[in-house]
Amino acid sequence: MVGTRPEAIKLLSVIRALDASAYYEPLVVSTGQHYKMVQDILDLAGIACEVTLWSGSRQANLNARVASVMERFEDFCAERFEVHSDRTPNEEDVLQGRFPAAVIVHGDTSSAMAAALSAFHKGIPVMHVEAGLRTGDIRSPFPEEMN
């Protein structure tokens, strides 16, 4: 899950390592936060983006953007995988590609928080890269430090 150019750059090696593995089939999902910049980085690396979750107006407020990412991720999971709230996946579901093994998010952006929360609500394990870096000031940077 990538939202910003720095996230895309930092996750390239993770995406490539997963792609080289015999055990995983990484699907790159963009939250749409920095759509063009993320797409440019992925294009340079030869990595395809499966879906962009938010393509709304840049004038939309933060709550609307977070809600859009969460709703679109839920829709994507229901369409691409057998992710439904009425059943618990098992190991066979993951091995057969019917359920994601995990969602990897990076950093402290609101789009990363939205994607992680949506995955958590669907029972998908969340791996958080670069978690825990703090400034100690809840208002700076805003809203990332609160996320």
Regions found by a protein language model. Name each.
Residues 1-2, 7-17, 56-147:
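Active-site and donor-binding regions of nucleotide-sugar-utilizing enzymes
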Residues 14-26:
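A short, Lys/Arg-enriched amphipathic alpha-helix followed by its capping loop at the start of a domain
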Residues 23-72, 76:
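Conserved nucleotide-sugar phosphate-binding/catalytic loop shared by glycosyltransferases and other
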